[in-house]
Each structure stands twice: as structure tokens, then as C-alpha cells.
């Protein structure tokens, strides 16, 4: 475990140095309506078949979902075996923090053997149904002596390493929930660099290299909101994040590694004046509404100044749109949340929590014809899903064979916390679809082709089963049976 008390003493100083330096939504194929938008015009459907409407009820059950929630502290991804992280899923988590240790390569290129082991580690992560919060760094100090001697690499070496890692990141993006900045300074937290990498220009160079290495639809989370505010004074809009080519501001979020631990979160929001510090907090809240946030708590330097009560985490978890949080540190916070009776709510609300209200679809259709549909839901979590993911109707015949119909324009990142969302549209049926009766299911599979058929990576809706109506979550298939039918004739 890292030297958190030591980090507390240095991060504020580094943030002070930073301050001194001054240094279209994809809705094709669907009509969307939200509480804040003007009512959409009625969609004229080609189909005149009667509609089957399913009303659904929410559940308070706490269950795992991909790319959100508490994470467990793991190991360098090159060391992940086929069974080393099975306990994570068994304990109800779907995320692990994987610190890539580059301390042996500060002055040389990454060997092919290390890159190959990274691929193997990610393959093993995939086998265990998990995703990574990934960070690479050149040092992980645990004592004051470690910190005083902590070394990173030169800018040219860092850029070379990122270029070497690019193919690995591209190949394994499906199991990388988010990449944290890393590389610069102590713990890869973008402060206290032995190679003077914390100047605005050098930080920007590392930022650009990381964005180049990542697929455009994967997020980069950085440590200090002052960096983002300097580069992008106006936070990105949701439409930018949902575009096929999102700009840099729409690809970068924040990780706060001393969440709630002091008045300025141990330097996270350090500024010369209280007003400037509050401006950074406001910026972080606005930016995280689109690009999400995560991190961990840490040992408070002054326990009396930490915000450890249930009211604090419930208020600020929502305000900063927290998607993921370290479950292994700091235990003092978790003890307070347990004692205050909110730990279960925190676990449920980290990230997204999508409750379906109604699902409607045509009840009769022809092979090769169109099927009208509509979906109404709300997000009761603290954040949007971090990565692209859309809905699909699944038609299941009497033999259990399934036909999947992706619903265009239903990227679930559109689900704003606390607000209702409704889509409607038509979807084409396969021309070769056999006549007969089909059970209708709703699914939200992983967007990656390699994981789309893996039920472990499917998003589970926060809805209760109903034995009377036939609504039932199908864990082996990763989809929700609606209890409704479609007749194809």
C-alpha cells in the first residue's frame, strides 16, 4: 500500500506549484425525449400492428455491473493469472485497479516480453469477467525514503513507452474501463517529477501521447482538475462525447485519489484563494457530468477535517459523478459509512443504475418488415456509463434460438443521472426470420464484438422480476425477459 500520509504532505505543495505556473449525439434511428428537452414530435411509424407494452418495477437489490462500482486493488497487469482475481467477482465487484510497474524501464525501452505478458494478463482478465482501471508509473513509494528517491523517466522515454504500449491498449481496450494518466511523478499522479515533467508543456505532451495511444471511444482520467481547467476552460458538452470523433476535452475526466479527505481533498483543489478552489470544484462537477470521475479516499491528514459521514459521500458522490472507488482504502471511511447505514446505497449508486419504466414493441410483424419499439428509463446512479453501450431487442424462438436487433440511437451514455429518458423508433427484422411466436427480451451488451456475447459483461437493469408478468433477468444470457411476445407471420 502506498505511503498515503506522505502523499498528503506533498500533493498540496505540488498543486501550489501548478497554480503558480498558471501555468452531436448519435440519435440516428430513434427519437429521444428527456425531462429537460422539448417534447419530440410524434414519430410516424410504418407499422400499424398493435403494441405490446410492458411496465416494469424497480428493485433495491445490489448487483455487479460492468465499468462501475467499487474496485479492488490488483497487480501489474502482466502478472494477472487465469485465476488470481476470481475472488473479485465472487465478492460482487467487476473492476480492478491494475498498476503497471515500469520502474525497471526508466532508461530503456519496454522489452517485448513485458508487452507480451500484458496481452496475456488482459486475456486472463477477460476470462474472469473483469475490467481494469489501468495506470502505468515508474515509482510507487511507500516510505519517506522511497519518496525522496522516487524517479520517473525523461519525456522522450515516456513518449517512447506510450508508443510501445499503444498496440497493447488498442488490442485490449475492451477490458480497459478507463486509463489513468500515470507516468509523471510520484505514483504517476502528475506531481513531484524527478525529470521536471510537471511543466504545462510537458504535461500536455504526455496527455497528447496518451490520447493518441487510446481508441477514441476510451476515456483518459487525470489527477488534477487545474490541468483540465487550464487546457479546456469550458468543459465538454455531452454531444461532443457522443460523437464519432470526440475532441480531447470530451475524452478526459478526473480521478481524485484523496476524495473527501480534507477541505481541498489533500491538494486536489488547492488554489491561492478559497474562491479559486471553489471554482476548481465547480469545474470538476461540470466536467465529470460528461466524462465521469473515480478514484479513492485516503488517510486524512487531519481526521477532524475529513468529510466521512454518510451525508458527505451521498452528496459529493452525486455532485462529482463518481463511477468507481477503491474498496481497499481507506477503511476509516468505509467504517463510517457502514455505521451510518449508507454503505449499501453507495455501492448501488456508484456509476450508473438504469431503471426501466416501460418497454413497448409491435406485437405482429412480417419477416423483412419493421418493428416499432419504445423504451423509457431513468438513471438512479451518480454517473452516466463511462463507455459506449446501446440497447437491443432479442427475439427468442421456441427452441431458444435468439435473433438480436440492435436499437440505433440508444447509446446509454445519454442517461443523465436523476432524469427520465425515452426513445422510440423502428427496427428492421431479418428477411429470413421464420414465422412463429417469439419471446421478447431487452439487452444492453458490451459494445466490443469480443464481449458482446458474454453475459458477464452485459449491463443488468435495476428492475424486479415478476412471476405474474414474466419479467425476469436471465443471468446466463445477460438479458431481461419482458414477458411479452411477437408473432411473425
Provide a role label for each language-model segment:
Residues 17-20:
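C-terminal motif of bacterial Sec signal peptides marking the signal peptidase cleavage site
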Residues 40-95, 99-101:
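Boundary/entry segment of secreted carbohydrate-active catalytic domains
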Residues 83-143, 155-157, 218:
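Aromatic-lined substrate-binding rim segments of carbohydrate-active enzymes
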Residues 114-131, 150-178, 200-213:
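An active-site-proximal structural segment forming one wall of the substrate-binding cleft
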Residues 133-143, 165-197:
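Active-site groove signature of glycoside hydrolases
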Residues 178-182, 189, 193-330:
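Catalytic-core regions of glycoside hydrolase
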Residues 309-361:
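Catalytic cores of secreted or luminal carbohydrate-active enzymes
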Residues 344-489:
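Extracellular/luminal regions of secreted and cell-surface proteins that mediate adhesion/ECM remodeling
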Amino acid at each position: 500500500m502506498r505511503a498515503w500520509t506522505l502523499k498528503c504532505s506533498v500533493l498540496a505543495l505540488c498543486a501550489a506549484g501548478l497554480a503558480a505556473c498558471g501555468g452531436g449525439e448519435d440519435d440516428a434511428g430513434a427519437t429521444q425525449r428527456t425531462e429537460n428537452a422539448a417534447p419530440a414530435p410524434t414519430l410516424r411509424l410504418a407499422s400499424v400492428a398493435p403494441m405490446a407494452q410492458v411496465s416494469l418495477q424497480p428493485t433495491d437489490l445490489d448487483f455487479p455491473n460492468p465499468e462501475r462500482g467499487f474496485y479492488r486493488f490488483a497487480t501489474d497487469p502482466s502478472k494477472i493469472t487465469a485465476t488470481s482475481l476470481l475472488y473479485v467477482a465472487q465478492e460482487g465487484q467487476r473492476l480492478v485497479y491494475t498498476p503497471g510497474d515500469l520502474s525497471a524501464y526508466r532508461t530503456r525501452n519496454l522489452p517485448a516480453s513485458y508487452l507480451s505478458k500484458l496481452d496475456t494478463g488482459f486475456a486472463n482478465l477477460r476470462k474472469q469477467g473483469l475490467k481494469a482501471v489501468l495506470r502505468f508509473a515508474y515509482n510507487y513509494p511507500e516510505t519517506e525514503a522511497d519518496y525522496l528517491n522516487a524517479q520517473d523517466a525523461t519525456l522522450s522515454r515516456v513518449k517512447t513507452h506510450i508508443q510501445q504500449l499503444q498496440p497493447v491498449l488498442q488490442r485490449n481496450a475492451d477490458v480497459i474501463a478507463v486509463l489513468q494518466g500515470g507516468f509523471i511523478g510520484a505514483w504517476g499522479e502528475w506531481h513531484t517529477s524527478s525529470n521536471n515533467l510537471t511543466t504545462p508543456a510537458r504535461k500536455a505532451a504526455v496527455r497528447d501521447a496518451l490520447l493518441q495511444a487510446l481508441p477514441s471511444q476510451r476515456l483518459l482520467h487525470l489527477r488534477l482538475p487545474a490541468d483540465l481547467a487550464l487546457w479546456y476552460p469550458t468543459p465538454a458538452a455531452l454531444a461532443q462525447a457522443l460523437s464519432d470523433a470526440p475532441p480531447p476535452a470530451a475524452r478526459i475526466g478526473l480521478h481524485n485519489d484523496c476524495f473527501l479527505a480534507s477541505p481541498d481533498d489533500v491538494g486536489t483543489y488547492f488554489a491561492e484563494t478559497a474562491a479559486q478552489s471553489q471554482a476548481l470544484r465547480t469545474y470538476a462537477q461540470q466536467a465529470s457530468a460528461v466524462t465521469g470521475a473515480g478514484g479513492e479516499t485516503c488517510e486524512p491528514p487531519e481526521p477532524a477535517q475529513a468529510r466521512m459521514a454518510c451525508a458527505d459521500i451521498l452528496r459529493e458522490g452525486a455532485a462529482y459523478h463518481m463511477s468507481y472507488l477503491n474498496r481497499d482504502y481507506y477503511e476509516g471511511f468505509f467504517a463510517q459509512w457502514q455505521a451510518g447505514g449508507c454503505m449499501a446505497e453507495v455501492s448501488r449508486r456508484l456509476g450508473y443504475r438504469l431503471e426501466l419504466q416501460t418497454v413497448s414493441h409491435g406485437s405482429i410483424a412480417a419477416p423483412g418488415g419493421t418493428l416499432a419499439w419504445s423504451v423509457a428509463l431513468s438513471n438512479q446512479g451518480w454517473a452516466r456509463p463511462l463507455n459506449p453501450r446501446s440497447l437491443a431487442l432479442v427475439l427468442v424462438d421456441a427452441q431458444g434460438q435468439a435473433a438480436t436487433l440492435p436499437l440505433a440511437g440508444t447509446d446509454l451514455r445519454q442517461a443523465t443521472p436523476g432524469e427520465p429518458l425515452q426513445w422510440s423508433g423502428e427496427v428492421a427484422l431479418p428477411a429470413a426470420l421464420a414465422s412463429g411466436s417469439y419471446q421478447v427480451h431487452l439487452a444492453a451488451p458490451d459494445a466490443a464484438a469480443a464481449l458482446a456475447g458474454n453475459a458477464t459483461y452485459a449491463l443488468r437493469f435495476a428492475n424486479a422480476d415478476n412471476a405474474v408478468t414474466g419479467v425476469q433477468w436471465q443471468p446466463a444470457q445477460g438479458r431481461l425477459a419482458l414477458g411479452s411476445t411477437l408473432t411473425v407471420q
